[in-house]
Amino acid sequence: MKELEILLNRRWILKSEDKELYYRVRDAVGEIRKYVTDKLGCQIIDNSLLIKLEKIPVIPEQFMGIGQFSSKEEYVYLCILLMFLEDKDAQEQFILSQLTEYMTAVMPGEITDWTLYNNRRKLIRVLRYTVEQGMVRVTDGTDDVFMDDALSLIHIS
């Protein structure tokens, strides 16, 4: 059950970052799945890219937020970014203009003005968070360039 402890302590196990651990946990998922479903009420998500124990709290607490985020808009941007990534294949590249066009099209309420520094800064915080979490990789350019109103190339992990 060492693998269960690993799943409890980590957000996810990415195959691209640790193949040995990914396959070790994947081999044990059959035993773990029944236990966590029956006893903990959790689900295990496993696919060709990652293994994750879905740990959703019954009552959310203040400390459970994302420390880098300072506004509700950043959480909205993250959700829309995740929607955008769902339509992409692993390792597929995109440029920030594609993302901002998508976000503008699906954003609830008023249209986001990407010429405003504050809006670009919030998106950069979200992108930096997704890079830290291994969801995307920057392959060309920097996020600082985007804040100065230019384009960068992003790579989906």
Segments predicted by a language model, with ranges:
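Eukaryotic partner-binding/assembly regions in large regulatory complexes
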Residues: 1-67
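Short capping segments at the starts of secondary-structure elements
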Residues: 2-8, 88-95
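A cross-kingdom feature marking solvent-exposed beta-strand/loop segments within repeated
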Residues: 17, 59-66, 105-122, 141-147
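Short amphipathic alpha-helical interaction segments
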Residues: 28, 116-129
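Positively charged, polyanion-binding regions of nucleic-acid-associated proteins
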Residues: 73-93
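Short acidic, hydrophobic short linear motifs in intrinsically disordered regions
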Residues: 90-110
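A short, conserved structural fragment
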Residues: 131-141
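Conserved small/polar residues in nucleotide/adenosyl-binding loops
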Residues: 154-156
